Regions:
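Conserved acetyl-CoA pyrophosphate-binding loop and the N-cap/start of the following alpha-helix
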Residues: 78, 82-87
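Short glycine/proline-centered loop/turn elements that form peptide/ligand docking sites
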Residues: 88, 109-111, 131-133
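Conserved active-site alpha-helix within GNAT-family acetyltransferase domains
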Residues: 107-128
Length: 138
C-alpha cells in the first residue's frame, strides 16, 4: 500500500534514485545542488511503498502568494497507478489558500493532460506567457 508523507527535510540519498530513474540529469550530475535544493524546499511529500520511496513532489515558494511545483516524480514502474495524482492532491489541499500554484513541464500530450486533470491551465488561457532565465554556465 502506498502512503503519502509530508516532509520538511529529505536526505539526498533517500531520493536520488528517483531523479536517476526518470533521467533528470541536471540534478543527478550536480548532487550538491540537488542536496541544497532539497534542504531549501518549502515542503516535500514522499510516496512510500513500505519504507521505499517511490515518488515525490517538491514545492518551493512562500506558501501564500506563490507556490511552485519544482518537481513531481514517480518511479516508472509505479506510474499510472494514481501516485502522482495523490501527491499533487495532497500538495494542493495543503496550499489551497495560496494565490497561485505554478509549474513548468515538458510540453507533451501526456503531461498537459495530466496537469489539466489536476486543475492547472496553460498560461495563455489567462493571456499570459511564462519566461525563465537559466544559468547556462552550470
Amino acid at each position: 500500500m502506498i502512503t503519502i508523507k509530508k516532509q520538511e527535510i529529505v536526505k539526498l540519498e533517500d531520493v536520488l534514485h528517483l531523479y536517476q530513474a526518470v533521467g533528470w540529469t541536471n540534478y543527478t550530475h550536480q548532487p550538491e545542488m540537488l542536496e541544497h535544493a532539497l534542504s531549501h524546499s518549502l515542503v516535500i511529500y514522499l510516496a512510500l511503498d513500505g519504507d521505499a520511496v517511490v515518488g515525490l513532489i517538491r514545492l518551493v515558494g512562500d506558501g501564500f502568494s506563490s507556490v511552485f511545483v519544482q518537481g513531481l516524480i514517480v518511479l516508472p514502474i509505479y506510474q499510472r497507478q494514481g501516485i502522482g495524482s495523490a501527491l499533487m492532491k495532497e500538495a494542493l489541499k495543503d496550499y489551497k489558500d495560496a494565490y497561485q500554484v505554478q509549474l513548468v513541464t515538458e510540453e507533451t500530450e501526456k503531461n498537459v493532460g495530466f496537469y489539466r486533470s489536476m486543475g492547472f491551465e496553460i498560461l495563455s488561457t489567462y493571456n499570459c506567457i511564462g519566461m525563465t532565465w537559466a544559468n547556462r554556465e552550470k
